[in-house]
Amino acid sequence: VLGHPAGLFVLFFTEMWERFSFYGMRVLLILFLTAALTGDNPGWGWNAENAGALYGTYAMLLYITPIFGGIIADKYIGYRWAVVIGSIIMTLGHLFMAFDTQFFMYLGLGCLVIGTGFFKPNMTSILSEMYKAFPEKKDGAYTIFYMGVNAGAFFGMMLCGYLANNVGWHYGFGLAGVFMLLGTLQFWLAKPLFGTIGEVPTEEGRLAKAAAAKAELKEGEEDKPNPF
Protein backbone atom coordinates (compact mmCIF):
# COMPACT_ATOMS: atom_id res chain seq x y z
CA VAL A 1 0.00 0.00 0.00
CA LEU A 2 1.61 3.26 -1.17
CA GLY A 3 4.86 1.32 -1.51
CA HIS A 4 4.79 0.16 2.13
CA PRO A 5 3.86 -3.14 3.82
CA ALA A 6 0.19 -3.43 4.80
CA GLY A 7 1.34 -3.88 8.40
CA LEU A 8 2.36 -0.21 8.52
CA PHE A 9 -1.26 0.87 8.24
CA VAL A 10 -2.30 -1.58 10.95
CA LEU A 11 0.24 0.14 13.20
CA PHE A 12 -0.95 3.54 11.96
CA PHE A 13 -4.55 2.94 13.04
CA THR A 14 -3.63 1.11 16.25
CA GLU A 15 -1.43 4.02 17.31
CA MET A 16 -4.02 6.55 16.18
CA TRP A 17 -6.78 5.02 18.33
CA GLU A 18 -4.41 4.66 21.27
CA ARG A 19 -3.41 8.32 21.02
CA PHE A 20 -7.09 9.24 20.62
CA SER A 21 -7.85 7.56 23.94
CA PHE A 22 -4.71 8.87 25.68
CA TYR A 23 -5.14 12.52 24.75
CA GLY A 24 -8.92 12.33 25.07
CA MET A 25 -8.55 11.18 28.67
CA ARG A 26 -5.66 13.53 29.41
CA VAL A 27 -7.56 16.64 28.36
CA LEU A 28 -10.34 15.73 30.79
CA LEU A 29 -8.44 14.56 33.85
CA ILE A 30 -7.45 17.81 35.57
CA LEU A 31 -10.67 19.52 34.50
CA PHE A 32 -12.69 16.71 36.06
CA LEU A 33 -10.63 16.69 39.25
CA THR A 34 -11.00 20.45 39.74
CA ALA A 35 -14.64 20.78 38.64
CA ALA A 36 -17.11 21.84 41.34
CA LEU A 37 -18.81 19.15 43.40
CA THR A 38 -22.22 20.57 42.53
CA GLY A 39 -23.89 21.61 39.32
CA ASP A 40 -25.03 20.01 36.09
CA ASN A 41 -21.69 18.23 35.50
CA PRO A 42 -20.01 17.82 38.91
CA GLY A 43 -16.40 16.78 39.39
CA TRP A 44 -14.34 16.08 42.48
CA GLY A 45 -13.74 19.65 43.61
CA TRP A 46 -9.97 19.27 44.10
CA ASN A 47 -7.69 22.27 44.22
CA ALA A 48 -5.28 22.79 41.34
CA GLU A 49 -2.25 21.77 43.41
CA ASN A 50 -3.58 18.31 44.28
CA ALA A 51 -4.90 17.72 40.78
CA GLY A 52 -1.54 18.69 39.31
CA ALA A 53 0.28 16.40 41.74
CA LEU A 54 -1.83 13.41 40.69
CA TYR A 55 -1.39 14.18 37.01
CA GLY A 56 2.35 14.73 37.46
CA THR A 57 2.75 11.38 39.22
CA TYR A 58 0.78 9.67 36.48
CA ALA A 59 2.87 11.32 33.75
CA MET A 60 6.13 10.41 35.52
CA LEU A 61 5.16 6.74 35.73
CA LEU A 62 4.29 6.70 32.03
CA TYR A 63 7.98 7.26 31.27
CA ILE A 64 9.21 4.60 33.70
CA THR A 65 7.08 1.55 32.87
CA PRO A 66 8.09 1.36 29.16
CA ILE A 67 11.61 0.45 30.32
CA PHE A 68 10.27 -2.71 31.95
CA GLY A 69 7.74 -3.39 29.18
CA GLY A 70 10.50 -3.29 26.60
CA ILE A 71 12.71 -5.66 28.59
CA ILE A 72 9.86 -8.15 29.12
CA ALA A 73 8.93 -8.10 25.43
CA ASP A 74 12.51 -8.39 24.25
CA LYS A 75 13.36 -11.32 26.49
CA TYR A 76 10.14 -13.24 27.04
CA ILE A 77 6.88 -12.49 25.23
CA GLY A 78 7.76 -10.71 21.98
CA TYR A 79 6.65 -7.32 20.70
CA ARG A 80 3.26 -8.37 19.36
CA TRP A 81 2.06 -10.02 22.56
CA ALA A 82 3.30 -7.00 24.51
CA VAL A 83 1.20 -4.68 22.34
CA VAL A 84 -1.87 -6.91 22.74
CA ILE A 85 -1.46 -7.16 26.52
CA GLY A 86 -0.84 -3.43 26.84
CA SER A 87 -3.85 -2.60 24.67
CA ILE A 88 -6.19 -4.79 26.72
CA ILE A 89 -4.96 -3.34 30.02
CA MET A 90 -5.32 0.23 28.70
CA THR A 91 -8.82 -0.50 27.41
CA LEU A 92 -9.82 -1.68 30.87
CA GLY A 93 -8.16 1.38 32.40
CA HIS A 94 -10.17 3.81 30.29
CA LEU A 95 -13.41 1.95 30.95
CA PHE A 96 -12.73 1.92 34.70
CA MET A 97 -12.30 5.69 34.63
CA ALA A 98 -15.75 6.06 33.08
CA PHE A 99 -17.31 5.07 36.43
CA ASP A 100 -16.16 8.38 37.99
CA THR A 101 -15.60 6.87 41.46
CA GLN A 102 -12.37 7.30 43.38
CA PHE A 103 -11.57 3.58 43.45
CA PHE A 104 -12.11 3.09 39.72
CA MET A 105 -10.34 6.34 38.85
CA TYR A 106 -7.15 5.24 40.61
CA LEU A 107 -7.51 1.69 39.28
CA GLY A 108 -7.95 3.05 35.77
CA LEU A 109 -4.88 5.28 36.00
CA GLY A 110 -2.86 2.34 37.30
CA CYS A 111 -3.99 0.21 34.36
CA LEU A 112 -3.04 2.97 31.93
CA VAL A 113 0.44 3.22 33.43
CA ILE A 114 1.01 -0.54 33.20
CA GLY A 115 -0.60 -0.88 29.77
CA THR A 116 1.46 1.97 28.34
CA GLY A 117 4.59 0.23 29.59
CA PHE A 118 3.81 -2.78 27.43
CA PHE A 119 2.35 -0.91 24.47
CA LYS A 120 4.48 2.13 23.81
CA PRO A 121 8.04 0.81 23.31
CA ASN A 122 6.95 -2.23 21.34
CA MET A 123 4.85 -0.54 18.68
CA THR A 124 7.90 1.25 17.32
CA SER A 125 9.97 -1.93 17.71
CA ILE A 126 7.56 -3.74 15.37
CA LEU A 127 7.78 -0.84 12.93
CA SER A 128 11.57 -0.90 13.03
CA GLU A 129 11.74 -4.66 12.42
CA MET A 130 9.31 -4.36 9.53
CA TYR A 131 11.75 -2.17 7.60
CA LYS A 132 14.98 -4.09 8.13
CA ALA A 133 14.78 -5.41 4.57
CA PHE A 134 14.32 -1.94 3.01
CA PRO A 135 15.74 0.70 5.37
CA GLU A 136 15.50 3.38 2.69
CA LYS A 137 11.72 3.48 3.27
CA LYS A 138 11.93 3.74 7.05
CA ASP A 139 11.86 7.56 7.18
CA GLY A 140 8.68 7.65 5.13
CA ALA A 141 7.14 4.94 7.31
CA TYR A 142 7.78 6.91 10.49
CA THR A 143 6.29 10.02 8.87
CA ILE A 144 3.08 8.12 8.11
CA PHE A 145 3.09 6.54 11.56
CA TYR A 146 3.37 9.90 13.33
CA MET A 147 0.58 11.31 11.19
CA GLY A 148 -1.58 8.75 12.98
CA VAL A 149 -0.28 9.98 16.34
CA ASN A 150 -1.21 13.58 15.53
CA ALA A 151 -4.59 12.70 14.04
CA GLY A 152 -5.53 10.61 17.07
CA ALA A 153 -4.46 13.34 19.49
CA PHE A 154 -6.47 15.99 17.63
CA PHE A 155 -9.72 14.04 17.36
CA GLY A 156 -9.39 12.55 20.85
CA MET A 157 -9.13 15.92 22.57
CA MET A 158 -11.91 17.37 20.45
CA LEU A 159 -14.48 14.56 20.69
CA CYS A 160 -13.86 13.41 24.27
CA GLY A 161 -13.80 17.02 25.41
CA TYR A 162 -17.04 17.81 23.59
CA LEU A 163 -18.81 14.75 25.01
CA ALA A 164 -17.59 15.38 28.56
CA ASN A 165 -18.63 19.03 28.45
CA ASN A 166 -22.04 18.53 26.87
CA VAL A 167 -23.17 15.12 28.13
CA GLY A 168 -21.07 14.15 31.16
CA TRP A 169 -17.57 13.33 32.33
CA HIS A 170 -18.07 9.58 32.33
CA TYR A 171 -19.15 9.66 28.67
CA GLY A 172 -15.94 11.44 27.73
CA PHE A 173 -13.81 8.94 29.62
CA GLY A 174 -15.90 6.09 28.22
CA LEU A 175 -15.40 7.25 24.62
CA ALA A 176 -11.64 7.02 25.15
CA GLY A 177 -12.13 3.39 26.20
CA VAL A 178 -14.29 2.59 23.17
CA PHE A 179 -11.63 3.77 20.73
CA MET A 180 -8.87 1.97 22.64
CA LEU A 181 -10.95 -1.21 22.30
CA LEU A 182 -11.28 -0.54 18.57
CA GLY A 183 -7.50 -0.24 18.25
CA THR A 184 -7.00 -3.47 20.20
CA LEU A 185 -9.42 -5.44 18.03
CA GLN A 186 -8.03 -4.25 14.71
CA PHE A 187 -4.44 -5.03 15.78
CA TRP A 188 -5.46 -8.51 16.95
CA LEU A 189 -7.38 -9.32 13.77
CA ALA A 190 -4.56 -8.07 11.53
CA LYS A 191 -1.74 -9.97 13.26
CA PRO A 192 -1.21 -12.36 10.29
CA LEU A 193 -0.04 -9.39 8.20
CA PHE A 194 3.13 -9.16 10.31
CA GLY A 195 4.36 -12.69 9.56
CA THR A 196 7.11 -13.54 12.03
CA ILE A 197 7.80 -9.91 13.01
CA GLY A 198 7.49 -9.36 16.74
CA GLU A 199 6.94 -13.00 17.66
CA VAL A 200 8.05 -14.57 20.94
CA PRO A 201 11.87 -14.39 20.94
CA THR A 202 13.98 -17.55 20.77
CA GLU A 203 17.55 -18.05 21.94
CA GLU A 204 18.69 -18.34 18.33
CA GLY A 205 16.92 -15.10 17.47
CA ARG A 206 18.52 -13.26 20.37
CA LEU A 207 21.97 -14.47 19.35
CA ALA A 208 21.34 -13.45 15.75
CA LYS A 209 20.23 -9.97 16.86
CA ALA A 210 23.30 -9.57 19.02
CA ALA A 211 25.56 -10.65 16.16
CA ALA A 212 23.84 -8.26 13.73
CA ALA A 213 24.14 -5.36 16.17
CA LYS A 214 27.82 -6.12 16.70
CA ALA A 215 28.42 -6.27 12.94
CA GLU A 216 26.63 -2.94 12.40
CA LEU A 217 28.68 -1.31 15.15
CA LYS A 218 31.91 -2.65 13.68
CA GLU A 219 30.94 -1.51 10.19
CA GLY A 220 30.11 1.96 11.49
CA GLU A 221 33.47 2.24 13.22
CA GLU A 222 35.29 1.18 10.06
CA ASP A 223 33.47 3.81 8.00
CA LYS A 224 34.49 6.65 10.31
CA PRO A 225 37.48 8.64 9.03
CA ASN A 226 40.51 8.73 11.28
CA PRO A 227 40.73 12.31 12.63
CA PHE A 228 44.46 11.93 13.24
Residue ranges, per PLM feature:
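Intracellular loop-helix junctions on the cytosolic face of multi-pass helical membrane proteins
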Residues: 1-10, 133, 161-228
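Hydrophobic core of transmembrane alpha-helices in multi-pass small-molecule transporters
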Residues: 16, 93, 103-119
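Central cavity-lining transmembrane alpha-helices of secondary-active solute carriers
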Residues: 52-73, 120, 154
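Glycine-rich segments within core transmembrane alpha-helices of 12-TM secondary carriers
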Residues: 62, 137-165, 172-183
